[in-house]
UniProtKB/Swiss-Prot annotation:
GO terms for molecular function: translation initiation factor activity. Interacts with MCTS1. It comes from Bos taurus (Bovine). Residues 95-110 have a biased composition (Basic residues). Keywords: Acetylation, Initiation factor, Phosphoprotein, Protein biosynthesis. May be involved in the translation of target mRNAs by scanning and recognition of the initiation codon. Involved in translation initiation; promotes recruitment of aminoacetyled initiator tRNA to P site of 40S ribosomes. Can promote release of deacylated tRNA and mRNA from recycled 40S subunits following ABCE1-mediated dissociation of post-termination ribosomal complexes into subunits. InterPro entries: DENR/SUI1_TIF, DENR_C, DENR_eukaryotes, DENR_N, SUI1, SUI1_dom_sf. The modification Phosphoserine is found at S73, S189. Pfam families: DENR_N, SUI1. Residues 9-20 have a biased composition (Basic and acidic residues). This is Density-regulated protein. One of its GO terms (biological process) is translation reinitiation.
Length: 198
């Protein structure tokens, strides 16, 4: 019954998937999966790390890599030189493509690991304590803010990129509390700036 449909339904069924099948293909199909992104090799170009996928394919399956590069070569324009092409590829990598994960961001370790504590006057005899630099030790600021608010029974908020404001003067106690909670922050990396104007 299935043979009758496939023989007669070639022109009449426009939406039928069977009319698009390759006649010379052997079923079941054998699909080559990439060792880097675990997708079929045809889809590697849509992943953010295309270069790694191509290196893997070239190393493990050079004949498939040759087919892939021959198929993609007519798409490239003849007028673009090597230098211009690589700059365009770098810019294209930065932008997230539809459906992909986007560029994987590298963490920067150039910032010195130092926690600074300052007492800032507010109104009359009221003060706030500013703690900066906890993010350089890869401490979650939201978690630290909740911890300080609970520990000192006061309001605390994350205000800047790497800044926590605690309502009240806790400069004496906070150094011990930080070292107790996060032992990776040693005594040498904590600096008390004293009273600082905003």
């Amino acid at each position: 019954m299935a043979a009758d449909i496939s023989e007669s339904g070639g022109h009449d069924c426009r939406g039928d998937q069977r009319s698009n099948t390759k006649l010379d293909a052997d079923y079941p199909l054998r699909v080559l999966y990439c060792g880097v992104c675990s997708l079929p090799t045809e889809y590697c170009e849509y992943m953010p790390d295309v270069a790694k996928c191509r290196q893997w394919l070239e190393k493990n399956f050079p004949n498939e890599f040759a087919k892939l590069t021959v198929e993609n070569s007519p798409k490239q324009e003849a007028g673009i030189s090597e230098g211009q092409g690589t700059a365009g590829e770098e810019e294209e990598k930065k932008k997230q493509k539809r459906g992909g994960r986007g560029q994987i961001k590298q963490k920067k370790k150039t910032v010195p690991q130092k926690v600074t504590i300052a007492k800032i006057p507010r109104a009359k005899k009221k003060y706030v304590t500013r703690v900066c630099g906890l993010a350089t030790f890869e401490i979650d600021l939201k978690e630290a803010q909740r911890f300080f608010a609970q520990k000192f029974s006061c309001g605390a908020s994350v205000t800047g990129e790497d800044e926590i404001i605690i309502q009240g003067d806790f400069t004496d106690d906070i150094i011990d509390v930080i070292q107790e909670k996060w032992p990776e922050v040693d005594d040498d990396s904590i600096e008390d700036l004293g009273e600082v104007k905003k």
